[in-house]
Each structure stands twice: as structure tokens, then as C-alpha cells.
Amino acid sequence: MIVAFTRVRRKAAAADERGSLPAGPPAAVLAVALLAALTAAVAWGSTSIPPGEVWSVVWRRLSGEAPRPGTDDLIVWQLRFPRALLAALVGAGLGLVGTAVQALVRNPLADPYLLGISNGASLGAVAAIVLGLGAGGALGLGLSGAAFVGALATFALVWAVARRGGGFAPLRLVLAGVAIGQFLSGFTSYLVLQAGDEQQTHSVLFWLMGSLSGATWELLAVPAVAVPTALLWLQARARGLNALLMGDETAAGLGIDVTRLRRELFTVTSVLTGVLVAVSGAIAFVALMVPHVCRLVVGGDHRRLLPLSALFGALLLVVVDIVCRTAMDTQELPVGVVTSLLGAPALLYLLDRRLGSVS
């Protein structure tokens, strides 16, 4: 028995180190790139603002100095900076959720939308728009609140179905999430058809395709707490995530309560997904693609993978949002459309490269 346990330990250590690269250099590069992207996101637009003035406005606001007269302060502090920060937070959160869900169900092609949570959030948001539930405009706090309630209700339903018969098996969890998610998606489509006017329909479709245009400092509050908290929680359980990828027996041999860890992972990823979808709508491919890219750089060890996924996800969504705002003069592109157009070819390339290296 002792020999078997020692072999399990060695197997886990080897899996932790396989294909790994120290996370420090890539993380430093991503951090610098993220800072540059945030600067560009605030500086670029219909009215260009010099980068030096951008950070001058931010510094004056943070230090409590009186803002200078003019439009630059309004554009930077009230419009573009909250949006850039929201893009970074949502991108980081999607990167974390994607990494965690892929470990939860032991499937590298899984993402949080597989569990049905985003479908529930979308139904809540569409109901708020079409049926007039909740206070606030189409991109106000009423919409976000309704989306989060929908996500939590779906979480409870998927949890109840997945727990039937005892245990918390990945296959049962995925099947429950897919089935419930498809049902909610059909109901959402029905509500879209019931939209009373063209403006309502446009608001619904634009939100369903992902949008950061409703960013405000008030809207930032919840994701600003939820994303760092989730990162710290997941980082503390990184070895458990590594063990889950090697199978339940191996994880149990390492002293991990597999069922409890899966329950906790499902809860955390569901709540975080609900928060993200509530403030940004459904943004595709980020949670699926980011972990794949980061694994190519630092390997599969979640101690390195989680922080790098958060940084890369933040950078990716900030850059995508710049494209969405500036690509067309007459209107803004939905964020989810751009992530799908960029993400699908990139993911196919990465998968082809990985499968080619295996063969």
C-alpha cells in the first residue's frame, strides 16, 4: 500500500512538472502588455487622448485632486476607464472559469457555457428587457440583477439534477447542464420573438452577443471583488485541480475529497459565471481558448496556469473591446461576435498543432 501511494505521489509530481515553464517571465510580459492595452483602450476612440494625459487624469482622481476643466476628464474617468477595467475583469474571470471547468469535468474542450449557467443568466436578462422586470434601463443594474438571479436559479436546478442518485460525477453534471441550458435557450428565443418593438429586439440581441458598453463604476463593484477572490480560492486548490485531471482514484490516493472539491468548484465557477454574464452578456470562446494558449506556454500545472489564464484573458478581452469600439465609425460591434471570429480559427490552429505534436 505504501509503495502504491508513493507511485501516486510521483505520478502527480511528474504531471505537475510536465511541459512546464516558469510562469514569471510570461506573466511579466502579459502584465506589461495588459498595461499598454489598458492605456490604448482609454486613449483611442472618436476623440483621441494622449497616453500621458490618460494617466494624469487617473492619478488626479486617485489622489483626490480636483479634475481639470474640459472633456478629457469626463471621457477618461467616466466613460473609457471603467469600460477598460470591466473588459479586463471579465476577461480574467472567463480565463479562470474556463481553466477551472476544464479541470472539473476533465475535458479540455469544456467551458462554463457547457454547464448551462450562461443560458440561465441570458434568460433572466431577456426577461428583464422584454417583460420589463427589474428597474433600470436595458444596460442598467436591473438587467444585471435579473441576469444574476437567472444564473443562480439555473445553478440550483443543475445542482439538483446532477445530485440525483448520489455522487457528483462529471458526466452527470455535463448532461444536466447541457439539457437544462438547451431548454432555457429555447425559452429565451421565444421571449425574443415576443419583443414588443424593434428597439427591444435590438437591445436583447446586442446583449446576447456580449457588450461592455454599459460599464460604470457601480457595475464594476461586484466583479472587482468576485474575480480576485475566485483567483485566490482556485490558486489555493491548484494541486487538487492537478490531481482531478489524473482521475478520481489518483486524486483520492493523494488524500483529496473528490466529491467535495467538485461541489465547491461547481459552486464557485457557477457564481463567477453568473457575475460575468450579468455585467457583460454572453461572450464566447474566451473561456475555451485562453486555457489552451496558456497550457502551451506553462504546461498543465494549475499553480502556473491559473494566474497566467487570468492575465491573458484580461489582455485578450481589452484588445477585443478596442477593436469593437474602433472598427466601425457608425456603430459598435458586439464583443461576442469578435471573440467568435477571432477565437474559432485560433482554436482550430492550436488544436491542429497539439494533435500534430501528439501524432
Predicted regions located by residue number:
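Alpha-helical transmembrane segments in inner-membrane proteins
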Residues: 1-359
